[in-house]
């Protein structure tokens, strides 16, 4: 897999594009820890590790959003989408909170 572009979102958060398509958002520390830079190649093992990190972050974010106030499934999806989580990861986070009966 080829990292085509890294676009800053905030001072510490970046959008990572792999093979021309948005893959996920990572923090500056994660980019340096996994040696991710524009025009670099990442292996499947690193990609899978990054996906696991983002899935865990999405689940924690969903749980945090529900501690502040009750939200509908649609509201929760919208907030996760605003947080730059990919659709398939949002689905995993939604399944996670549904498994506890929170949504």
Spans of model-derived segments:
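An alpha-helical, amphipathic repeat domain used for nucleic-acid recognition
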Residues: 1-103
């Amino acid at each position: 897999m080829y990292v085509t572009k890294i676009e800053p979102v905030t001072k510490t958060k970046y959008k990572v594009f792999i093979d021309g398509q948005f893959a996920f958002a990572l923090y500056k520390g994660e980019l340096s820890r996994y040696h991710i830079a524009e025009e670099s190649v990442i292996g499947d093992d690193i990609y899978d590790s990054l996906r696991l990190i983002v899935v865990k972050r999405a689940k924690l974010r969903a749980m945090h959003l529900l501690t502040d106030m009750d939200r509908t499934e649609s509201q929760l999806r919208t907030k996760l989408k605003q947080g730059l989580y990919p659709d398939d990861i949002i689905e995993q986070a939604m399944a996670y909170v549904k498994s506890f009966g929170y949504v």
